[in-house]
Amino acid sequence: MADGERSPLLSDLGDGALGSGNGGVSPGAASLGAPNKPQSFPPFPSSTQPPVLLSENPPPYSPLTSPESGSAPVISCRVCQSLISVEGKIHQHVVKCGVCNEATPIKNAPAGKKYVRCPCNCLLICKVTSQRIACPRPYCKRIINLGPVHPGPASPDPQPAGARVSCGHCSNTFLWTEFTDRTLARCPHCRKVSSIGQRYPRRRSLWCYLLCLLFSISAAGLIAGTWSQAQVYGGIYASWAAALLLVVLTLARALYWSCMRVSQPLHNLT
């Protein structure tokens, strides 16, 4: 956030504010002087002038003369293009325009800093490594994205971690990374599900066979114990059906896990 660089470069700035920023957002960028109200705010720059001027350099001194200062050196305001006298202000980094009350730099930014102008025309100063700064004006508060400081060639994509697997259905090879005790993989080629290794489906089929055996014994005991009562109470047949349904379901799941195709890992990439 704000790094405390709030010392004004121009003591008598009004609305020409200088803010400080670091590598993140600087919501507390300092403003030099009380800002004007939004209704007296100058219009935004035209389409020929970019709204955000990154690393803005000071304009050169103009050989023209200002009517108020005689032969004093003047520069053009970066906002309204009016002439600003810099006589007696050479030691300052920025000067204030008397027409639009915005700041214009007359010196290069201090070492390690750069100038940035907000779309609201507020002149900000931030670190050269800053990627985002916030305008300090209460009626603006824009977040200005400056982008990477040292753009370069994109780093190569990291090598994927995992193993190449041969599908048990179509024998095509695909990459799989989620190796757990419950590993089922869907082949991206045939879209069928298979198991990575035989341990998981074998264990599941064993549990289903045991449950099927337990439900079969229970169903047989229920039928044998209620055979005579079922002749009188027809609702007992529903309990028989439920018990037999559990037997069929567990048997079907046991057969499903027993017949599941197994995909074999080929070699690791990590």
Curated annotation (Swiss-Prot):
Which residue intervals make up region (Disordered)? 1-71
Residues spanning the membrane: 206-226, 232-252
Q: Which residues form a coiled coil?
A: none
Query: Where is the major localization of this protein?
Result: membrane
**Keyword Manganese: yes or no?**
no
GO CC terms, sorted = late endosome membrane; lysosomal membrane; phagocytic vesicle membrane; plasma membrane
- Chain intervals with Gly residues compositional bias: 16-26
Q: According to its record, how does it sit in the membrane?
A: Multi-pass membrane protein
Give the record's keywords alphabetically: Endosome, Hydrolase, Lysosome, Membrane, Transmembrane, Transmembrane helix
| The protein's name | Type I phosphatidylinositol 4,5-bisphosphate 4-phosphatase-A
